[in-house]
UniProtKB/Swiss-Prot annotation:
Lineage: Bacteria, Pseudomonadati, Pseudomonadota, Alphaproteobacteria, Hyphomicrobiales
Location in the cell: Cytoplasm
Family note: Belongs to the TRAFAC class OBG-HflX-like GTPase superfamily. OBG GTPase family.
Subunit (UniProt): Monomer.
Residues that hold GTP according to the record: 166-173, 191-195, 212-215, 279-282, 308-310
Keywords in alphabetical order: Cytoplasm, GTP-binding, Hydrolase, Magnesium, Metal-binding, Nucleotide-binding
A molecular function GO annotation: GTPase activity
Protein name: GTPase Obg
Pfam families linked: GTP1_OBG (PF01018), MMR_HSR1 (PF01926)
BP GO terms, sorted: ribosome biogenesis
NCBIfam families with a match to the protein in the record: Obg_CgtA (TIGR02729), PRK12297.1 (NF008955), PRK12299.1 (NF008956)
EC number: 3.6.5.-
Annotated organism of origin: Bradyrhizobium diazoefficiens (strain JCM 10833 / BCRC 13528 / IAM 13628 / NBRC 14792 / USDA 110)
Cytoplasm among keywords: yes
Length: 346
């Protein structure tokens, strides 16, 4: 399944049906009177969170959505049928923005949640509505009201309990594949991961959802590399696991590079709880490992965990540290179905 986390969509609710001008024409009824029915109401445009979705890819191929128009009224006091609503299905974690891409309209956080984005127009009154003691045979009726139309942006922020961050090639995808059933692409070159990945992790009988996003590089907040556009997917996480490559030139500088990008992004990431771990400890000599650990400790101002995603050493300890922060009620119950959905491809 292709991954798409942003889409521009045009929506229009249905116009109301027109009211009808009609009169009763029945035998033996000399003054039948008005009998024009009202028009039906136009259909609404509704956004609904669907279980099992984790991408907005459907909106790459169709961008225009229109609800049905209400039917016109008819004689014999027959009201027009209401137009059918149109329902757009989105993944949990989707946000709706106005066309300016800045004004937040709604934020979806629960499966089954619905939001009426555009209401259909009211149907017009038929001439029977205007009958009064002074106007026994009105010959006027109202047209239906037009529906609402607008362009909107759908933006997906995946919901996970914990998020993996780090420079490209820090071993995040290897870690995710080691602790979950997720099968991200793994290779020994930067930017192997091009899209966020989700995995369901079971640690000591506790399940939670872990998100892996493409690696950050210096200047990502200015658009360098893949930029910081994927950071929104870990903005909702309760805790970040920051992996630093022990084989890099300077672990402290590597940590600060990513930390600078997180702070530049701002939002909820600046004060997010962070667990720091030195990865690939199996690939360096003991003396070099001690130097890298000390460098990272000084930069992060905390003692880093030591692990090797490749061999599994230290991985359980890292998972237990995540579980301790996530607490007793992880959001994985909401996000698990999305994490277990069909994986994305590049």
């Amino acid at each position: 399944m292709k991954f798409l986390d942003e889409a521009k969509v045009y929506i229009r609710s249905g116009d109301g049906g027109n009211g009808c001008v009609a009169f009763r024409r029945e035998k033996f009824i000399e003054f039948g009177g008005p009998s024009g029915g009202n028009g039906g109401r136009g259909g609404n445009v509704i956004i609904e969170v669907a279980d099992g979705l984790n991408t907005l890819i459907d909106y790459r191929y169709q961008q225009h959505f229109k609800a049905q128009k209400g039917e016109n009224g008819a004689g014999s006091d027959r009201h027009g049928a209401n137009g059918k609503n149109i329902v757009l299905k989105v993944p949990m974690g989707t946000q709706i923005f106005d066309e300016d891409r800045e004004t937040l309209i709604h934020d979806f956080t629960n499966v089954g949640e619905k939001f009426v984005l555009a209401e259909g127009g009211n149907g017009g009154f038929g001439n029977a509505h205007f009958k009064s003691s002074t106007n026994r045979a009105p010959r006027n009726a109202n047209p239906g009201q037009p529906g609402e139309e607008r362009w909107i942006w759908l933006r997906l922020k995946l919901i996970a309990d914990a998020g993996l961050v780090g420079l490209p090639n820090a071993g995040k995808s290897t870690f995710l594949s080691k602790v979950s059933a997720a099968k991200p692409k793994i290779a020994d070159y930067p930017f192997t991961t091009l899209h966020p990945q989700l995995g369901v992790v079971n640690a000591d009988g506790r399940e939670f959802v872990l998100a892996d996003i493409p690696g950050l590089i210096e200047g990502a907040h200015e658009g360098a590399g893949l930029g910081d556009r994927f950071l929104g997917h870990v903005e909702r996480c309760r805790v970040l696991l920051h992996l630093v490559d022990a084989t890099c030139e300077h672990a402290g500088k590597a940590y600060k590079t990513v930390r600078t990008e997180l702070d530049a992004y701002g939002g909820l990431l600046t004060d997010k709880i962070e667990i720091v771990a030195l990865n690939k400890i199996d690939a360096v000599e003991p003396d070099e490992l001690k130097k890298q650990k000390d460098r990272l400790k000084r930069a992060a101002k905390k003692t880093p965990l030591l692990l090797s995603a490749a061999t599994g050493e230290g991985v359980k300890e890292a998972l237990r540290a995540l579980v301790a922060v996530i607490g007793e009620a992880p959001v994985s119950a909401k996000a698990k179905s999305a994490a277990e959905a069909e994986p994305w491809s590049a």
